[in-house]
From Swiss-Prot:
It is a multi-pass membrane protein. It comes from Deinococcus radiodurans (strain ATCC 13939 / DSM 20539 / JCM 16871 / CCUG 27074 / LMG 4051 / NBRC 15346 / NCIMB 9279 / VKM B-1422 / R1). This is Potassium-transporting ATPase ATP-binding subunit. The system is composed of three essential subunits: KdpA, KdpB and KdpC. It catalyses: K(+)(out) + ATP + H2O = K(+)(in) + ADP + phosphate + H(+). The gene is kdpB. GO terms for cellular component: plasma membrane; potassium ion-transporting ATPase complex; potassium:proton antiporter complex. Its main location: membrane.
Amino acid sequence: MTTAPQPKQSIFSPELVRGAVRASFAKLSPRDQARNPVMFVVYLGTALTAYLTVANLVTGKPWGYELAITLLLLLTVLFANFAEGMAEARGKAQAASLRSAREDVKARRLVNGQEELVAGTALERGDLVVVEAGEMIPADGEIVEGLASVDESAITGESAPVIREAGTDHSGVTGGTKVLSDRIVIQITSGAGESFLDRMIALVEGASRQKTPNEIALSILLSGLTLIFLLAVVTLYPFTVYAGAPASAVTLIALLVCLIPTTIGGLLPAIGIAGMDRALQANVIAKSGKAVEVAGDVDVLLLDKTGTITIGNRMATKFHPLPGVTEAELAKAALLSSLADPTPEGKSIVALARQLGVDAPEPAGAEFIEFTAQTRMSGVDFPGTSIRKGAGSRISALAQERGGQLPPELAAITDEVSRQGATPLTVIENDRLLGVVALSDIIKPGIRERFEQLRRMGLRTVMITGDNPLTAEAIAKEAGVDGFLAEATPEDKMEMIKQEQASGKLVAMMGDGTNDAPALAQADVGLAMNSGTQAAKEAGNMVDLDSDPTKLLEVVEIGKGLLITRGALTTFSIANDVAKYFAILPALFVTAYPQLGVLNVMGLHSPTSAVLSAVIFNALIIPVLIPLALRGVPYQPMSAGALLNRNLLVYGGGGILVPFIAIKLIDLLIGGLMS
């Protein structure tokens, strides 16, 4: 992973804290508070205790206790606002850095073959723009002519330039990046304010962040618990009246605030925002919080072999001619079919042929046939000759269509190359099969261990490749994936995704080409490469700025971290209520029912100190947990059952133990001050 586009700041850096403090007070409006039902109850309780404090002050009654509770409840609300403000401030800092990458540059627009200088903001979809070395790319687009080295560090943080080329899956360019060499013609794909950078800034700022389905479900649960505790507290008041020691309204409000799940209620918005923030720290732009959340629930990962499982630099390593064909004949035919092939594989075939002393000029009247995922072959036609190279099954079918024979040795050569983990490309000239070109790749170091981790997480990995089944099987075994789809076409990918989804599975995949767009849109998590085509980036619900195919594995871990953090803090928050129950409930009834003093297991000094201690802890635990909410609970690959048991022990047990200790310490401090 590369460095993020902005300098990483510590969680509590002065700039972020100042912004979060301002946001804490700005969010005190009823409209903002009403978005969070749990904290809205605390907000209303604060207003009511403030009213009772003023009423006591005016009528000459004691008001110190009421004022203390009011200030503590206000702090609880402010701390919850501060948590959300911290998460938002981090996003705004990142957005400011991204915005600095956007410059209003001049563009050289092509009109009827003539260049005219216009403002970058005046460009519209479909315009053709010329960009040369040293110039900024004015807007998002697709290269339609040429090849260039592009500096994308303003977007990705990666200082190494990348190659962008017309007619490939790496033809997409982003406004705000800089051309370092050569000349390209770009067709603009976004209007003013609609560029990828503009959308990134809007997403990072989170101005229109929507709650995710799990977040909504949890909010409903927390609201239900709040309603139950509200009814319970209201019911307690008649009991205290009947006992002859009516509880004050302020104490009942304090009890309610301590019992409702204010900890998770105050941290929930921050956890959701922080999930998208952690994705951005990994240089992944998530188009919604839902995309990050769903990544944590994914069951099946569809992974492209090239670039994800292997290094992705397949090179021609050997020519295997059939009987009756010389190596030079095979090399020449393969070279001719690859002269216009822009792929690394095609260029390596030309290089290998020339190493063997075989060379040939481009034939007169040559028409080059590009490779497509549907045909799975490429080649060249010129007068009297038609040469194709491609997948063995497709070339064999072509040979039969042309009336040629299938030499029995072909299958043996193909199988041997495949068993070695190389990709066999079969070459045919007219109706005569010439032999096989072996393309070799290398399994990425450590990838097998990574897949083992995913298996322990309960995920199934499927390798997608255009290779024949034997090659696919050899690589799948070496890499340790759970399954593979060989000789895959875009339609095959789509069909597999639909089948998995029909069986109730959530599917994640990555892609970079226009032909990947339908599958990216169909997948529950579609990670598009920033270097890919505009269609792929539009179809996916995440974009990887580093264009690293292995990033899909990291995205899944980020999603799981988000879900685990939310679950762990919810468990901790609800477990807190047990300790606060033992602190406040005896304080309510001990005067009327002295025998209830046995419930005062913490040995708190007095009813007043008990209530104050619980409310102080209830307020302070929110800022204490902010770093955990923003960083996330560390995720370790393990089964769902083991993960649940660990979280119940750590966060459930800790949620009971920590308040017992903290409330007792606060009570000792209050008792010392009061004495």
